[in-house]
């Protein structure tokens, strides 16, 4: 066995998925010429056009996602700068008003100081006399004195509309008095100060009332509109947002997460509160302030902040516990509920789903990985006690109705059931762009299961690998018989070719509920199918790893003895000429055993691979190729043939030629004659002819006609398969049920 294992080591191939970015690198180049590229693609076929469309759609999605990330990365800085500019503009306006007021005071003081009584003209005295007697001016001063008291009364009685009208009236009169100088500078500045003080008082009243939880929608909008009329729009908008925040915070007091409650219910209730508040705030902002960029930017910043806080609450009270326990369905449903509420805001121009994804995606990925790990560990535990006998699904299983298709061993049944449940859970992951990650994770789990199947083969490499990490996974029930070993391949091939791809089709369904949308479904299918086709191809390539290990193991069993000696040595051909002409030509023993083994496996495969005959044929083809290619590449064998102490004689050449013809004959009858097999046998024959020619004899003069070889091959197949010459009909195909004779009876016809 040590010799077999030493010869069976090979470097495993690694599958690397082609990244989309590599395929799109051409489009990202600064030197990309769109017109030249389109012209070069005008002659491509339909398949290439579809592939190009897929690449362009991927580029579009990647570009949109990159732009969104860039916007959100720089948005806080943009908002902060905009707000600073707005504040600066407000300060400049205040400074301008202050300078104007001070200029008026200075001019008034200058006029009073510079009056010279000695130089007062008669005209000035007359004008002063007229002004003193002007009753209108006295009434204005009286009004200016009483106006602050009138404002105080309106504010005390909370007659907001009348107060706003009074403020407007007062500001108009102040403006006129300032232009016409109908009031003294002291009275004018006193009046301006009184109006500003009362306006500030009213603004404080409105802001306080707006932030009360008892303030209803109409009252809130009226208060904010009044606050805006007072001339402080930025504060009014901030108060509006704070009011909505205070209201939903007050409503949240009755919402308390419980360790025994369903996380989805808590998430749904909290989502309703938060995103309804954001939606109403957006509606109020648009109705009162319009689409002014400064206010829209503040709304986006505020909504993003509330969404961040919401996501942290859901993460702490609903997602974290589910993810830690590997509850993928619970975690995915919580995330889906939140994203569903959040997506409704996109109609209002608020795209906040990326904010949720930033927090939800890592923790849902954690639940996804925990779920996959559980599938891997449970399947490995089942494999430790698997008897490797194909059975129908357990009674009561949801897959029992398709039992005729799903005959698997116990560990594969368990793996399939867990995968089906897994894909029931991952539907909501599509909205988080985790569909590809789910497929990749399941590929890793399936690859791990195939490794378990490989270790179940007697003398497998992995079983003796000291670097293999998980010691618990080394415990696996050995598949001792050929039927058990074929069951390993039946497990892997059925899972990779049918069951897993069929389950993965659930990812192609429209999870938004619009499954009957005939316009969207073809596009979704076109976009997702290439990824799933590539995924299925990778699954099947993983099965090839098990197939190679199976064929290598059986080829080594044929070629080597338990002690490490070879059944396929040069001596069996170079020594045959010592027996002289008295040789009963028949295929060599090792090729008789190969034929018998293939027949036994074909008989077993007929029951195990129902509906998958192509896989059975490819397996027999691979096993035959393994033996022939090993002989073709065995340098020690050819060194003995070409340079050994005894040259290859005519009878040895004839026997070697017969063996290769025999392989070609039964492979052709069994429908598994491949190009590689044909090439390998031809190469062996060519090497043998060349070695014989080196002795100075024409090889073709020593070889009988092809009919002689064909007759012996047909006779050998009939005898080895238990048929008599009188039995008409074709030799049983190795892909049909064959009752082959035992190897011991085959040895009676062997010759060296």
Curated annotation (Swiss-Prot):
Biased composition (Basic and acidic residues): 515-532
GO cellular component, one term: exocyst
Residue ranges, annotated region (Disordered): 511-532, 724-752
UniProt KW Transmembrane keyword: no
Disruption phenotype: Sterile plants with extreme dwarf phenotype and cytokinetic defects, and accumulation of vesicles in leaf epidermal cells. Impaired trafficking and endocytic recycling of ABCG36/PEN3 between the trans-Golgi network and the plasma membrane in root epidermal and cap cells leading to a strong intracellular accumulation of ABCG36/PEN3 and lost ABCG36/PEN3 outer lateral plasma membrane polarity.
Keywords on record: Cell membrane, Cell wall, Cytoplasm, Cytoskeleton, Exocytosis, Membrane, Protein transport, Secreted, Transport
Cellular localisation: Cytoplasm, Cytosol; Cytoplasm, Perinuclear region; Cytoplasm, Cytoskeleton, Phragmoplast; Secreted, Cell wall
GO terms, biological process: exocytosis; Golgi to plasma membrane transport; protein localization; protein transport
Matching SUPFAM superfamilies: Cullin repeat-like (SSF74788)
InterPro entries from the UniProt entry: Cullin_repeat-like_dom_sf (IPR016159), Exo84 (IPR033961), Exo84_C (IPR032403), Exo84_C_1 (IPR042561), Exo84_C_2 (IPR042560)
Origin: domain of life: Eukaryota
Bias kind Low complexity: ranges: 733-752
Family per record: Belongs to the EXO84 family.
Record's function text: Component of the exocyst complex involved in the docking of exocytic vesicles with fusion sites on the plasma membrane during regulated or polarized secretion. Involved in polarized cell growth and organ morphogenesis. During cytokinesis, involved in cell plate initiation, cell plate maturation and formation of new primary cell wall. Probable component of an exocyst subcomplex specifically involved in autophagy-related, Golgi-independent membrane traffic to the vacuole. Regulates autophagosome formation and autophagy-related Golgi-independent import into the vacuole.
Quaternary structure and interacting proteins, as annotated: The exocyst complex is composed of SEC3, SEC5, SEC6, SEC8, SEC10, EXO70A1 and EXO84B. Interacts with SEC6, SEC10, SEC15B and EXO70A1. Interacts with EXO70B1. Binds directly to B1L.
The protein's name: Exocyst complex component EXO84B
Organism: Arabidopsis thaliana
């Amino acid at each position: 066995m040590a010799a077999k294992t030493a010869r069976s080591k090979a470097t495993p191939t690694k599958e690397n998925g082609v990244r989309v970015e590599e395929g799109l690198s051409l489009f990202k180049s600064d030197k990309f010429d769109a017109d030249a590229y389109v012209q070069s693609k005008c002659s491509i076929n339909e398949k290439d056009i579809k592939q190009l469309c897929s690449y362009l759609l991927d580029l579009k999605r990647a570009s949109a996602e990159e732009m969104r990330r860039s916007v959100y990365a720089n948005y806080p800085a943009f908002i902060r700068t905009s707000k600073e500019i707005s504040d600066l503009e407000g300060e400049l306006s205040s400074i301008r008003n202050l300078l104007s007021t001070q200029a008026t005071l200075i001019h008034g003081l200058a006029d009073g100081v510079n009056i010279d009584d000695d130089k007062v003209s008669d005209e000035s005295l007359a004008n002063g006399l007229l002004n003193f007697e002007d009753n209108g001016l006295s009434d204005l001063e009286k009004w200016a004195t009483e106006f602050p008291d009138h404002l105080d009364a309106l504010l005390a009685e909370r007659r907001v509309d009348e107060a706003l009208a009074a403020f407007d009236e007062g500001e108009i009169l102040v403006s006129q008095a300032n232009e016409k100088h109908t009031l003294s500078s002291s009275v004018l500045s006193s009046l301006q100060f009184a109006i500003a003080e009362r306006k500030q008082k009213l603004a404080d009243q409105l802001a306080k009332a707006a932030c009360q939880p008892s303030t209803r929608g109409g009252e809130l909008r009226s208060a904010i509109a009044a606050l805006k009329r007072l001339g402080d729009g930025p504060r009014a908008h901030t108060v509006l947002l704070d009011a909505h925040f205070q209201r939903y915070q007050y409503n949240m007091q009755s919402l308390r997460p419980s360790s025994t409650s369903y996380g989805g219910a808590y998430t749904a209730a909290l989502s309703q509160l938060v995103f309804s508040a954001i939606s109403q705030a957006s509606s109020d902002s648009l109705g009162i302030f319009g689409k002014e960029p400064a206010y829209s930017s503040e709304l986006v910043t505020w909504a993003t902040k509330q969404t961040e806080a919401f996501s942290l609450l859901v993460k702490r009270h609903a997602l974290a516990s589910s993810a830690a326990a590997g509850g993928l369905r619970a975690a995915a449903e919580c995330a889906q509920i939140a994203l569903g509420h959040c997506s409704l805001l996109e109609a209002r121009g608020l795209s906040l789903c990326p904010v949720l994804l930033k927090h939800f995606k890592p923790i849902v990925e954690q639940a996804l990985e925990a779920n996959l790990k559980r599938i891997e560990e449970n399947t490995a535990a089942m494999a430790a006690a698997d008897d490797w006998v194909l059975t129908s699904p357990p009674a009561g299983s949801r897959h029992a109705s398709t039992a005729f298709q799903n005959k698997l061993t116990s560990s594969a049944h368990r793996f399939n059931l867990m995968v089906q449940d897994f894909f029931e859970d991952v539907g909501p992951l599509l909205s988080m762009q985790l569909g590809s990650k789910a497929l990749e994770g399941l590929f890793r789990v399936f690859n791990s299961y195939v490794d378990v199947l490989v270790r179940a083969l007697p003398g497998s490499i992995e079983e003796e690998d000291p670097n293999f990490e998980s010691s618990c996974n080394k415990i696996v029930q050995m598949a001792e018989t050929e039927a058990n070993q074929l069951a390993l391949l039946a497990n892997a091939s059925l899972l990779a070719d049918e069951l897993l791809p069929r389950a993965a089709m659930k990812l192609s369904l429209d999870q938004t509920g619009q499954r009957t949308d005939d316009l969207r479904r073809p596009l979704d299918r076109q976009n997702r199918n290439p990824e799933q086709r590539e995924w299925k191809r990778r699954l099947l390539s993983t099965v090839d790893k098990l197939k190679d290990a199976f064929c290598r193991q059986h080829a080594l069993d044929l070629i080597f003895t338990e002690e490490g000696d070879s059944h396929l040595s040069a001596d069996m051909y170079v020594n045959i000429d010592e027996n002289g002409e008295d040789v009963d030509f028949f295929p060599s023993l090792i090729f008789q055993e190969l034929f018998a083994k293939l027949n036994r496996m074909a008989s077993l495969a007929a029951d195990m691979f129902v509906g998958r005959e192509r896989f059975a044929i490819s397996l027999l083809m691979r096993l035959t190729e393994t033996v022939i290619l090993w002989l073709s590449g065995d340098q020690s064998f050819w060194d003995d043939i070409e340079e050994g102490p005894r040259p290859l004689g005519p009878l040895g050449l004839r026997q070697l030629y017969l063996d290769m013809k025999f392989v070609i004959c039964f492979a052709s009858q069994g429908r598994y004659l491949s190009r590689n097999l044909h090439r390998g046998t031809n190469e062996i024959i060519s090497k043998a002819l060349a070695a014989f020619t080196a002795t100075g004899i024409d090889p073709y003069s020593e070889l009988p006609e092809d009919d002689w070889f064909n007759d012996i091959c047909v006779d050998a197949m009939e005898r080895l398969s238990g048929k008599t010459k009188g039995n008409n009909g074709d030799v049983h195909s190795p892909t049909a049920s064959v009752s082959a004779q035992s190897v011991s009876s085959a040895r009676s016809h062997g010759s060296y």
